[in-house]
């Protein structure tokens, strides 16, 4: 799996493809499925590379979307305004509950799963309907020298993290003016009109 922050370029790209989408919702939605990883590790002694319900379509479209909405509406404006000194009232407006925000949170969750899907030796995307070990990521298969899925996963993981990291650097360079507003809200602070 790409490191959680490296799911950001997909959220940013979606917001550029459709300007009506809500960037904070896409960001939070693209990060939320990985919330289960430390929880599984800390409370259930499950390996750090394991996933569960939030990495399935069933979980992402229900629990993941609900958590994403709650975090985007109630936590994101507070944290980003505290850390980056954004105008809290503008952030609350950008992060208010709307059908577009809900859809953006849902899309963020789905695209997290799709990015993970291509580079894992198993996928819970169709859980509980299909055995996760019957779904092998295309990059894992491409790089599985001699059928070694672990080697395929290692190469796919490194390659995916590298590519997403390069996209992240490109996004930062492209948005260096008003960087934080551009990459966290999607608009320059003075472009927000309410």
Predicted features and spans:
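N-terminal membrane-targeting hydrophobic helices
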Residues: 1-194
């Amino acid at each position: 799996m790409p490191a959680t922050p490296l799911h950001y370029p997909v959220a940013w790209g979606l917001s550029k493809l459709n300007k009506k989408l809500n960037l904070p919702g896409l960001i939070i939605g693209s990060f939320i499925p990985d919330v289960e990883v430390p929880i599984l590790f800390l409370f259930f002694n499950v390996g750090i590379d394991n996933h569960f319900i939030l990495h399935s379509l069933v979980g992402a479209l229900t629990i993941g979307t609900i958590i994403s909405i709650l975090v985007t509406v109630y936590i994101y404006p507070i944290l980003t305004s505290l850390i980056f000194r954004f105008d809290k009232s503008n952030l609350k407006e950008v992060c208010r509950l709307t059908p577009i925000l809900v859809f953006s949170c849902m899309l963020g969750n789905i695209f997290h799963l799709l990015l993970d899907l291509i580079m894992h030796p198993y996928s819970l995307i169709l859980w509980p309907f299909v055995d996760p070990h019957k779904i092998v990521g295309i990059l894992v298969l491409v790089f599985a020298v001699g059928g070694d899925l672990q080697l395929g996963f290692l190469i796919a993981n490194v390659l995916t993290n590298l590519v997403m990291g390069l996209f992240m650097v490109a996004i930062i360079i492209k948005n260096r003016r008003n960087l934080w507003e551009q990459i966290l809200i999607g608009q320059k602070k003075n472009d927000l009109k309410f």
